[in-house]
Amino acid sequence: MAGKIADVEKVILTASGGPFRDVKDLAEVSLADALNHPTWNMGPVVTINSATLVNKGLEIIEAHYLFDIPYNKIEAVIHPQSVVHSMVEFKDGSTIAQASPPNMKGPIAYAIAHPDRIAQAMPAIDWKSAHAWSFAPIDHERFPAVELAKRCGALGGAVAAMYNAANEVAVAAFMKEEIPFTAIVDTIEKTVTTLGGQAQSVVRDMKDVSAIENDARRVAQEALAKR
């Protein structure tokens, strides 16, 4: 974006779609299925967040705060190859894409060395080889986490923190195989519906955020206990 936020029409984040982008019955998927990511090698919690697309919801919230971009200008699309990681569309119709192999070495090196770049931080894309990149819209009925994150973020206050806290509780339960996969995002939505008004209040400091997070964890655990 080069600091020219006024020229930005939209920011597009990409999601691999996780292991379930083509699976019809998400209620029947197992923990082992969820941990079998097709393109990334990550820890278990992040891998499950990728499967639910909660990770993309969190990235949308992060982009909003890091770059002061309105939520209605941030989108996410499915990109199974995980090579194009984000794009910025400008008001003149042009788009700049950030592309690299699915490897966290590059982003970590860039964060450490910014504004400089570390030589050969990771292998570059071989542009002489044939590549097929595809993009598709997210099916928000099957994967409601992204739109839910945008709604939470738009509500303001600490609702986004509530989204994250409820997710952590639900993912922990799924990893213990206590709940089905589809219950993860259901639990987040129930928590936000129950406490969203409270979390919209003005956040003065980290004590306020911690209190709201604790309330969200409690309500999420209560919702899971009622299943």
Identify the meaning behind each predicted range:
Residues 1-227:
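Catalytic, metal-anchored helix/loop core of enzyme active sites in primary metabolism
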